[in-house]
């Protein structure tokens, strides 16, 4: 299914023209809904602390989670106490739920589990982001709210908007759902504070982000990084992210011999039997996001690659300046 959609959205499949009338309808609905909030006919919830939205205008993963982790570390370094809210995709959550390092992905979603495991950040997940934000402020000592996704959740007022764009795929065929990958028109990118480009090449006015591999970690936590597979070794690779080929290309660039690769749909659930059969006796390499979903049954030779986002110093300075301005405005 995912490969067919990729052909439609990114490879110029002619079927996109048949779906164009539905895209026009989708565009009209989303525009009308946005205008209801813009003119005040539908209320927006505001909060006494800055709200930063990390989202995108395309369907699928683009690098939001590494960006959220980058923001957490940047803001903490400068004395802020951020917290994160998220939808918790792929799991059914009644109301809202605080996320702790002991939670697994089946309880809170894969991205929240990964973010909290890496940073131990205060975090609340739930379908209603307003309720999640309120519980975050009620239960934790937080002075900035970061929303992992939620760019189109206009009921939540925001102070800073960041769009993460896949630098290789960019806007695909430029069409809205279902003919293309866009949730909103490309014009939306011009209305946000920053467009962050993951990979590829940033265009004028965009911020270039690089995902830098750091260290191999044992998925089950029982093995030392010193025993991780070495380059030139035969391995099996898997990825259930928005753009799996990016991970496979990274491994090839690092020198690993990919005996087999398996792309799964984003937010896929994994079973021990499926992954054991996939790997056989070879080391199984995966992303950090995949690892949080199989650490309970992982074998000793399963590894995940941690990556750190790198952004220009100028972006850091601009963001911190804007955060300071918002804090001062809210204190008046």
From Swiss-Prot:
The UniProt record lists the keyword Lipid biosynthesis: yes
Residues bound to ATP: 58-65
Pathway participation: Glycolipid biosynthesis; lipid IV(A) biosynthesis; lipid IV(A) from (3R)-3-hydroxytetradecanoyl-[acyl-carrier-protein] and UDP-N-acetyl-alpha-D-glucosamine: step 6/6
Catalytic reaction annotation: a lipid A disaccharide + ATP = a lipid IVA + ADP + H(+)
This protein's GO CC annotations: plasma membrane
Keywords assigned: ATP-binding, Kinase, Lipid A biosynthesis, Lipid biosynthesis, Lipid metabolism, Nucleotide-binding, Transferase
One of the GO BP terms on file: lipopolysaccharide core region biosynthetic process
Signal peptide annotation: none
Entries under Pfam families matching the protein: LpxK
Coiled coil region boundaries: none
Entry similarity comment: Belongs to the LpxK family.
Function field: Transfers the gamma-phosphate of ATP to the 4'-position of a tetraacyldisaccharide 1-phosphate intermediate (termed DS-1-P) to form tetraacyldisaccharide 1,4'-bis-phosphate (lipid IVA).
Name of this chain's protein: Tetraacyldisaccharide 4'-kinase
Name of the gene: lpxK
């Amino acid at each position: 299914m995912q490969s067919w959609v990729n052909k439609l959205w990114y490879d110029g499949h002619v079927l996109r023209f048949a779906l164009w009338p539905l895209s026009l309808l989708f565009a009209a609905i989303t525009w009308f809904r946005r205008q209801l909030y813009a003119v005040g006919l539908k209320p927006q919830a505001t909060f006494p602390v800055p709200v930063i939205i990390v989202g995108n205008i395309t369907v699928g993963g683009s690098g939001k989670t590494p960006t959220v982790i980058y923001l957490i570390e940047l803001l903490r370094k400068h004395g802020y106490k951020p917290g994160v809210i998220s939808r918790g995709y792929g799991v059914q959550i009644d109301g809202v739920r605080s996320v702790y390092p002991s939670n697994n992905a089946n309880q809170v979603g894969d991205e929240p589990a990964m973010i909290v495991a890496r940073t131990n950040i205060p975090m609340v997940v739930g379908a209603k982001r307003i309720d999640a934000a309120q519980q975050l402020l009620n239960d934790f000592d937080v002075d900035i709210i970061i929303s992992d996704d939620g760019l189109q959740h206009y009921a939540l007022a925001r102070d800073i908007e960041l769009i993460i764009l896949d630098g290789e795929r960019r806007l695909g065929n430029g069409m809205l759902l279902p003919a293309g990958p866009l949730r909103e028109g490309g014009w939306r990118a011009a209305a946000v504070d920053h467009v962050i480009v993951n990979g590829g090449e940033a265009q004028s006015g965009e911020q270039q982000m690089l995902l830098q591999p750091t260290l191999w970690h044992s998925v089950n936590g029982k093995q030392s990084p010193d025993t991780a597979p070495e380059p030139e070794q035969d391995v099996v690779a898997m990825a259930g992210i928005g753009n799996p080929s990016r991970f496979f290309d990274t491994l090839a660039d690092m020198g690993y011999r990919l005996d087999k690769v398996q792309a799964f749909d984003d937010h896929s659930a994994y079973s021990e039997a499926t992954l054991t059969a996939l790997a056989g006796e070879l080391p199984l390499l995966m992303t950090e996001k995949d690892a949080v979903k199989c650490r309970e049954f992982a074998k000793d030779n399963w590894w995940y690659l941690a990556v750190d986002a790198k952004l220009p110093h100028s972006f850091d300075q601009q963001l911190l300046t804007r955060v300071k301005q918002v804090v001062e405005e809210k204190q008046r």
